[in-house]
Amino acid sequence: MSISKSLVLNEIKKFSPSHIIIGYSGGVDSSVLLNISKELDIPLIAIYINHNLHRDSLKWQIHCQQTCQKYNLQFISHSLDKVPKGESFEAWASKQRMAFFQKIMQQYSKPLLLLGHHQDDQAETFLIQAIRGSGLAGLAGIPHYKELHHGGVLRPLLKYSKIEIEGFAKLNNISYIYDDSNEDIKYRRNLIRNQIIPILQQVNPNISQTLSRSANICAESNNILQKLLTERLQSISQDTNLIISELIKLDDDIQKNLLHLWFKQNTQQSLKSKQIKELHLAVNNPSTGWQIDISNYYQIHIQYNQLIIKYPTTINDISKKDIISWLSKNLNEEIDLTKIVIRDRKPDDKCKYRGRNKPNKLKILFQELQIPTTERSKAKIILKDQQIIAVYPFFICG
């Protein structure tokens, strides 16, 4: 199947965008997308993200800039910082790119972001998600279109193969760059593309098309499942809380899916499999006061017959200056601020309350000191040399 320029243009036009933003790397995919999209009578902004990893990254940026000048298109470049230690470069870079795209999109009334993902990308993503053990949502892979907080993102080339895109570029004399780092198999996607896919092609020459079709089937199935779960979730919810007695009437598999959906709808974050299992066990053996830390930002509590998401206050909500001032007044010693760490409370935190021989869990101390449950979420843990020395604004430890 060859690329139909008119079909691609009509697909873009049906969204009636005020502005088109293109993620433009200079590679063949985004170069073909730029070449087609420039024919629209819609303001177009091409964005080049410089990852600062390749020796030729600046040359590529100049190539993209010159191409945009040739077609009289607006060009924006953005350089990424060094990836934080311990993070996956691929995942981190993807988040950084999307964050910058959305920053630019917010300047326009109805922007549409175009990305050059194609059928082979979809097949690779399906395999990556399968290797991770993902469910339907993960196996659905790369969405063809997705609503964003402001505007949307469309991938018009997703049904076309890499070979078809390269053929279009050759036929239309489109110049593009080649990134030889795509051959580096230390990156998982490159390993799958260069070594695993060729082996699978020996079994099925159309493997990319087949896996892409499987991803589409998973996407359709997941959409149906989410609609049904959303309807059920509404019937067992009270505002943002989940009614436990209604939830546990359902089959275990439905319970787990509803717990995942409930949390995602209210936080825009996903629960891990281990957290879902722990939550499922807790709601089927409910105990008022039970809680679990999901991340540094969210806690889930059981209060009587309801499952509640709590949003612990952060250091930004409480002035760090106020906490240090409180500590200075209540701690009878000199404070070296360079050794002080302030964080949110964790379920297993313990403190040796003054006058006691051994530490107790904070939950027990809160109960003994009759600190109301509604006030406990305000607690900030103050540490020195990795030891808890105080619980703001309640008491000193030690």
UniProtKB/Swiss-Prot annotation:
Membrane as a keyword? Answer: no
Q: Which species is the source of this protein?
A: Francisella tularensis subsp. mediasiatica (strain FSC147)
Q: Pfam families, per this entry?
A: ATP_bind_3, TilS, TilS_C
Write out the annotated subcellular location.
Cytoplasm
Gene Ontology, cellular component aspect: cytoplasm
Keyword annotations from UniProtKB, A to Z: ATP-binding, Cytoplasm, Ligase, Nucleotide-binding, tRNA processing
Give the EC number(s) under which this enzyme is classified: 6.3.4.19
Sample GO molecular function, one term: ATP binding
Provide the top EC class: ligase
Q: Which GO terms describe its biological process?
A: tRNA modification
Name the chemical reaction catalysed here.
cytidine(34) in tRNA(Ile2) + L-lysine + ATP = lysidine(34) in tRNA(Ile2) + AMP + diphosphate + H(+)
Give the main localization category: cytoplasm
Record note on domains: The N-terminal region contains the highly conserved SGGXDS motif, predicted to be a P-loop motif involved in ATP binding.
Tell me yes or no: is Transit peptide among this UniProt entry's keywords. Answer: no
Q: What does this protein do?
A: Ligates lysine onto the cytidine present at position 34 of the AUA codon-specific tRNA(Ile) that contains the anticodon CAU, in an ATP-dependent manner. Cytidine is converted to lysidine, thus changing the amino acid specificity of the tRNA from methionine to isoleucine.
Q: Give the protein's recorded name.
A: tRNA(Ile)-lysidine synthase
Q: Give binding positions for ATP.
A: 25-30
Q: Which family does it belong to?
A: Belongs to the tRNA(Ile)-lysidine synthase family.
